[in-house]
Amino acid sequence: MRILIILSIILCSLSIRADLEYVDNEIYNYNGGSNENGCVEVYDPYEKFNRKVFVFNSVLDYIILRPLAVGYKNITNDYVKARVNSFVSNVDTPLTAINYGLQLNYDKTMKSVWRFLINTTLGIGGLFDVAGKVGLPSDRQTFGSTLAHYGVAPGPYLVLPIIGSTNARDMTDSVITNYALNPLMYYTHNDFDLGVLAVSKINDRYVVLPFSDYVMKNSTDPYVAIRSALHRVREASVQYPENFKCPKPKN
């Protein structure tokens, strides 16, 4: 049983989840950043390699992860899904506080800390978003956001096996934020804990199920559609320095 749960956790970290969860999270946790001085065009010098990895990851997702997400959709009600979403959002909050601290934004750092404390206590471990009802809405920041805050451009677009779509700057999020510093990755003392982690990852995939299904069924080039969506939403969600200008890609 424990081995099966661990396997499901690994599989729930596949590329389409990583790609589309990222888009979804950035859309619904948009922090007011502007893309007026951002990088409009995607720099994809490794497109040939990226496309091959995209196909590989997409096949694994279709065979393994998507069926899990569809099953989760069918056997859970809206109330359960809302509790899981709230719990996962609460787990992300300390990382948001850390990144606002690195950006020297004291006000938002403290708001993130208070949001986490309120939801962890009054919200019963984050199952309920009490803080949001008292003026402390969800606000997601990552290490990639912090690098952008200090003027780091996105760099080359990359699609990595298992990890999924990212760019040179936001690889810190793919590896550090989502895995190394994700508290859920260490909250696995028994089968129940592993089950909680597995459900949270399956929920991540479920959240973007409508978007992923639409792209895969209707887009003439799903690779370009997902690449464009990721880049556009990400650039709109980060806040560059006032005088930042996106560097022109080297030929």
UniProtKB/Swiss-Prot annotation:
Residues making up the signal peptide according to the UniProt record: 1-18
Query: Which ranges of the sequence are coiled-coil?
Result: none
What's one GO BP annotation on this UniProt entry? intermembrane phospholipid transfer
Q: Which InterPro entries match?
A: MlaA
Q: Which UniProt keywords apply?
A: Signal
Domain of life, source organism: Bacteria
Q: Does the keyword tRNA processing apply?
A: no
- Sorted alphabetically, which PANTHER family does this protein's record hold? INTERMEMBRANE PHOSPHOLIPID TRANSPORT SYSTEM LIPOPROTEIN MLAA (PTHR30035:SF3), LIPOPROTEIN VACJ-RELATED (PTHR30035)
Protein name (record): Uncharacterized protein RC0123
**What is the originating organism of this protein?**
Rickettsia conorii (strain ATCC VR-613 / Malish 7)
